[in-house]
Regions:
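Ribosome large-subunit tunnel/peptidyl-transferase-proximal elements
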Residues: 1-76, 98-110
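C-terminal structural segments of small proteins and small subunits
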Residues: 81-99, 103
Length: 110
């Protein structure tokens, strides 16, 4: 049986977040959360938040043993981008792209 959690429009870069998600994939929940807490970055806190939400979903269904959960899949998709402009010299402007991410986590029991 699976437990899922989804976070949309998170203000972190999908490209950088995927590097962290690759480290967590296929690990047990306790080990994954321990690793994310040691990193302490914004991306790590956001992924840990989604993992904790998936664990809470598993507990609420009541059919899963929380100690035997592992990260079956974690998917980082690109959300909508926010476009901003930064003034430059001689009346010009550069475009700043602020990226967002959609994070989907699926946990499964061993």
């Amino acid at each position: 049986m699976e437990s899922k959690a989804l976070l949309k429009h998170s203000r972190v870069s999908p490209q950088k977040t995927r590097l962290l998600a690759d480290q967590v994939r296929s690990k047990r929940i306790a080990e994954a959360l321990r690793m994310l807490n040691l990193l302490g970055t914004k991306r790590a806190r956001i992924i840990a938040k989604v993992l904790n939400s998936a664990v809470a979903n598993a507990m609420n269904t009541g059919m899963m043993d929380v100690d035997n959960l592992y990260v079956k899949s974690i998917q980082i998709d690109e959300g909508p981008t926010m476009k901003r402009f930064r003034p430059r010299a001689q009346g010009k402007a550069n475009r700043i792209i602020k990226r967002t991410s959609h994070i989907a986590v699926v946990l499964e029991e061993l």
